């Protein structure tokens, strides 16, 4: 499958496959089709995500509770932008604005129906930034707001505009689910 078009397409394709193997199925131009992939995700304090009362929670799951772990479904839009969801892409993470209040929501939307080119879908778009082995996710609709957890376990996954605050975790590990 050719990833890019143009005189340097083979070099760019090779670099993308080597550097971004999980996103190699998507053309960098943002044109579809991009395949959805499921990932295990955990914060730098080893908290995983699970669903409680229709809210995404970060906590330490052990024993029989391990089966509650939510996998994050990701659809690459372009080299750094992604849509994120859970439950097979049927519940999508979005950035909701209400006055000065900005919060993370789960919306019943099929992740594969979203489009980078639709303004109304911008709230579902997250900019993925890698720094070493960790990744952060910034809302495209609310620049400066990052997906986060708190140091305390069993608290909601949310958004913050103070990513350097000591009680907030904005860096995540993730690996493709087998």
Curated annotation (Swiss-Prot):
The protein, known as: Interleukin-1 receptor antagonist protein
InterPro entries: IL-1_CS, IL-1_fam, IL-1RA/IL-36, IL1/FGF
UniProt record similarity statement: Belongs to the IL-1 family.
GO annotation terms (biological process): immune response; inflammatory response; insulin secretion; lipid metabolic process; negative regulation of heterotypic cell-cell adhesion; negative regulation of interleukin-1-mediated signaling pathway; response to glucocorticoid
Origin superkingdom: Eukaryota
Matching Pfam families: IL1
Free-text function comment from the UniProt entry: Anti-inflammatory antagonist of interleukin-1 family of proinflammatory cytokines such as interleukin-1beta/IL1B and interleukin-1alpha/IL1A. Protects from immune dysregulation and uncontrolled systemic inflammation triggered by IL1 for a range of innate stimulatory agents such as pathogens.
Keyword Manganese attached: no
Keyword list, A-Z: Cytoplasm, Disulfide bond, Glycoprotein, Secreted, Signal
Name of the coding gene: Il1rn
GO CC terms of this entry: centrosome; cytosol; extracellular region; extracellular space; nucleoplasm; vesicle
Signal sequence range: 1-26
PANTHER family cross-referenced by the UniProt entry: INTERLEUKIN-1 FAMILY MEMBER, INTERLEUKIN-1 RECEPTOR ANTAGONIST PROTEIN
Disulfide bond annotation, renumbered to this chain: 92-142
Any one GO molecular function term: cytokine activity
Residues carrying a glycan: 110
Taxonomic lineage from the root: Eukaryota, Metazoa, Chordata, Craniata, Vertebrata
Consequence of gene disruption: Deficient mice still possess other negative regulators of IL1 activity and adapt to excessive IL1 via shedding of IL1R1.
